[in-house]
């Protein structure tokens, strides 16, 4: 069975940012080129995986993840009559990767009755992975409470982030959020510090850890965070 070229159809069906779309495109073109003169068989998939072994472990995992998602799309849309999946590579642990294992925290104290601006800021960072610069660009109208999503625009790219009910029930009654969003970075820093000893960076990392635990791919997570590259996230996928 030949590998059909449905790359454009696949990318159109996904709500990727321009950068994430570009990453998937090149990964899938690489896959398509390999199978140009080969049939898709389990043996051929093993050969493809072997060819990837010359790349870094992170690049191998990325290309395999892209390929597996593409195979699933083809199978679900009846473009191929058999589902194929490449087994992910197991990255050998190195001293650097072993030394970085941050613990996931739940922060139940963040989800009490809303009592101060710092608590609202902490929730924005933990629920959406926002930094202070992104919070300063928010408008209350960006929150769609009917359909439970937050729209953020950064460098001309829009991100649509889901709003969880546990966040909505605590903050949607706020009347003066735009006043907070208009404050200086120093003001936001001070208010967060009044509420918790955790820094914005530490809280944002917890958002990342929870998304990794939930099964988000490195590309999906980069898209959620509005990142133009995946470099800063690779350590969480080792």
From Swiss-Prot:
The active site is at residues 154, 204, 236. CDD domains: INT_StrepXerD_C_like. Belongs to the 'phage' integrase family. XerD-like subfamily. Residues 1-75 form the Core-binding (CB) domain. Putative tyrosine recombinase. Not involved in the cutting and rejoining of the recombining DNA molecules on dif(SL) site. The keyword Coiled coil does not apply. This is Tyrosine recombinase XerD-like. Residues 90-238 form the Tyr recombinase domain. Keywords: Cytoplasm, DNA integration, DNA recombination, DNA-binding. PROSITE patterns: CB (PS51900), TYR_RECOMBINASE (PS51898). InterPro entries: CB (IPR044068), DNA_brk_join_enz (IPR011010), Integrase-like_cat_sf (IPR013762), Integrase_catalytic (IPR002104), Integrase_recombinase_N (IPR010998), Tyrosine_recombinase_XerD-like (IPR020876). One of its GO terms (cellular component) is cytoplasm. It is found in: Cytoplasm. The keyword Cytoplasm applies. GO terms for molecular function: DNA binding; tyrosine-based site-specific recombinase activity. GO terms for biological process: DNA transposition. Its main location: cytoplasm. It comes from the Bacteria.
